[in-house]
Amino acid sequence: MARNVTKRNKRCRGHQKAIYKKKSHSSSESGLRNYSLYINRVLKEVVPQKGISSRTIDIINTMINDMFERISTEACNLMYYRKRCTLTPEDIEKAVYLLLPEKLAKYAVAFGKEAVQRYVRS
């Protein structure tokens, strides 16, 4: 499989060196994840007797991928505005607060912190 090499300028403090990143044109390496298994698991926990169509799962999966992409883009922009080379949890938290309505962002950040703590403890 042929791969192209793209050139990006790194905008970190003190580093103006170009970064070379391999770029693949394969559809399997597009970076999008499939969350259908997790969507079904959550549905069975919440409403055990109900099902969900594959089209609905595809729509929810697209929404999840889109939201993760928006959060990562906004967090990356915040990182560059602060002239930092490291993405911190605070950048992600601020990105969530910028993208989501106030109450929803508050719950998302709280549940996200709790999930990270459970992961660290296990």
From Swiss-Prot:
Tissue-wise, where is it found?
Testis-specific. Restricted to the spermatid population of seminiferous epithelium. Not present in Sertoli cells, spermatogonia, spermatocytes or cells of the interstitial tissue (at protein level).
Q: Which gene encodes it?
A: SUBH2BV
Question: Which InterPro entries is this protein grouped with?
Answer: Histone-fold, Histone_H2A/H2B/H3, Histone_H2B
SMART domains assigned to the protein according to its UniProt record, in alphabetical order: H2B (SM00427)
Q: Which UniProt keywords apply?
A: Cytoplasm
Molecular function (Gene Ontology), one example = DNA binding
Compartments annotated for it: namely: Cytoplasm
Q: Which family does it belong to?
A: Belongs to the histone H2B family.
Q: Which domain of life is it from?
A: Eukaryota
Role played:
May act as an acrosome-nuclear docking protein in sperm.
**Record flagged with keyword Cytoplasm:** yes
Protein name according to UniProt: Histone H2B subacrosomal variant
Q: Which organism is it from?
A: Bos taurus (Bovine)
Composition bias (Basic residues) maps to 1-25
Cite a single Pfam family from the UniProt record: Histone
Region (Disordered) residue ranges read: 1-30
Listed GO cellular component terms? cytoplasm; nucleosome; nucleus
The record, for Gene3D superfamilies, names: Histone, subunit A
